From Swiss-Prot:
PANTHER family: SWI5-DEPENDENT RECOMBINATION DNA REPAIR PROTEIN 1 HOMOLOG. GO terms for cellular component: centrosome; nucleolus; nucleoplasm; nucleus; Swi5-Sfr1 complex. InterPro entries: SFR1 (IPR042429), SFR1/Mei5 (IPR018468). It comes from Homo sapiens. Transmembrane segments: none annotated. Component of the SWI5-SFR1 complex, a complex required for double-strand break repair via homologous recombination. Acts as a transcriptional modulator for ESR1. This is Swi5-dependent recombination DNA repair protein 1 homolog. Residues 149-177 form a coiled coil. Widely expressed. Residues 1-54 are annotated as: Disordered. Component of the SWI5-SFR1 complex. Interacts with RAD51; the interaction is weak. Interacts with ESR1 in the ligand-independent and ligand-dependent manner. Belongs to the SFR1/MEI5 family. One of its GO terms (molecular function) is transcription coactivator activity.
Amino acid sequence: MAEGEKNQDFTFKMESPSDSAVVLPSTPQASANPSSPYTNSSRKQPMSATLRERLRKTRFSFNSSYNVVKRLKVESEENDQTFSEKPASSTEENCLEFQESFKHIDSEFEENTNLKNTLKNLNVCESQSLDSGSCSALQNEFVSEKLPKQRLNAEKAKLVKQVQEKEDLLRRLKLVKMYRSKNDLSQLQLLIKKWRSCSQLLLYELQSAVSEENKKLSLTQLIDHYGLDDKLLHYNRSEEEFIDV
């Protein structure tokens, strides 16, 4: 209120003719015109200290209020600009981050799909290899099952013959052991000769009995058929005869 009264008092004094002579000399036009009577009066009557102080205060008050309003306006505009710019930049950064994260997720998803496909291919290959191995095994089994019966019978006869030979050899060894324990070697040799002669005669009888009218079996065939030893019988294959008959 005090400043408002001072301003009113100052304007009232500025309107009076006595004070107009004081204010006008401050303008450049008045100072440039030496023929004006007001300039002479202003030179004779300078501005008082109180008026200068009031003028300074009024100018400062007007300028300060205008500057404050202007500063507030500028600051509000700057704040609006910063607030409007920051969200845009933040949203752009967020969008970029989301895009990068989506790219990373897409790359990981592609890698996972590739790994799954490779694992599936490996499983398929393993299953195929197992299936091929099982198929080959089954084929081998079927082939072995489809062998001709004649071949199986021949294998069976061969095994039976080997068993008989082993049993015969074992029986002879037992006889030899028994005779050695009870008798001397001279008697054993006599028994061997008797057994050889009996075997030779038996083979001759078999040859005459088995052979047909037009076809006669050889001693070699009979010996091979029964699996006898040529050395024990003293048989000569080239001549097809016994040595000590």
